[in-house]
């Protein structure tokens, strides 16, 4: 508060009214992601593996998105997608006996739509999130930075949880990873 008063009294040129609006918008968007996280934790009904997995993917996605300088809207869509990216795993385990990636992609769209129906997320964004979740095990046809970062964040977590070989990690580095931040993380974690 002291710094703000100093700047206001010394004609800093900063429009604090606009700054306050920007801060409130960011806080509102952060609450949407936080509410989605809480809802997803409840959705997984105590499955610590599923909960910890999505939280790790969300954390990597959030970090990579920020490091790559995503605009606020793309960052929010990315984070919400990371939260729900494995939403169909419980259904797939029950229906097919496993959570195969292609089956996850097939089963996820209606679950994503239902999940977001009572959260303040634009219909256009829900469609994008649903599409991304329905492709998060497909490494071709990447059509945006949100998709690219989701693939990288999920792989960073899966590589550790499933003890992928050094050769597998090296292959992904050469064929899938594109962002500078994702590449740095992959090398730092798995290729030392």
Where are these regions (language model features)?
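Divalent metal-dependent phosphate-bond-processing catalytic cores, especially two-metal-ion Mg2+/Mn2+ enzymes
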Residues: 2-7, 11, 23, 27, ...
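His-Asp-centered metal-binding catalytic motifs of divalent-metal-dependent phosphohydrolases/nucleases
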Residues: 75-97, 108, 130-137, 154
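An active-site-proximal "capping" alpha-helix that borders the catalytic cofactor pocket
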Residues: 57-60, 102-118
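Short helix-capping and hinge/turn segments at secondary-structure transitions, especially at repeat
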Residues: 66, 88-96, 113-117, 121, ...
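Compositionally biased, low-complexity intrinsically disordered regions
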Residues: 9, 16-18
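Active-site flanking loop/helix segments enriched in acidic
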Residues: 33-56, 88-99
């Amino acid at each position: 508060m002291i710094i703000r008063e100093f700047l206001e009294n010394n004609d800093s040129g900063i429009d604090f009214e606009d700054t306050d609006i920007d801060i409130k918008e960011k806080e509102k968007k952060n609450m949407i992601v936080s509410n989605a996280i809480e809802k997803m934790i409840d959705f997984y009904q105590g499955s610590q593996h599923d909960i910890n997995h999505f939280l790790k993917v969300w954390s990597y996605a959030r970090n990579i998105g920020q490091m790559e300088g995503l605009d606020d809207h793309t960052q929010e869509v990315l984070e919400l997608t990371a939260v729900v990216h494995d939403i169909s795993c419980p259904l797939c385990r029950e229906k097919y006996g496993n959570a195969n990636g292609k089956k996850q992609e097939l089963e996820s769209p209606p679950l994503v739509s239902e999940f977001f129906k009572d959260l303040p997320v634009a219909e256009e964004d829900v469609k994008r999130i649903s599409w991304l979740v329905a492709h998060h095990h497909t490494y071709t046809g990447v059509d945006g930075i949100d998709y690219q970062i989701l693939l990288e964040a999920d792989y960073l977590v899966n590589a550790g949880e499933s003890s992928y070989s050094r050769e597998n990690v090296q292959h992904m580095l050469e064929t899938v990873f594109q962002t500078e931040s994702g590449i740095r993380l992959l090398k730092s974690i798995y290729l030392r």
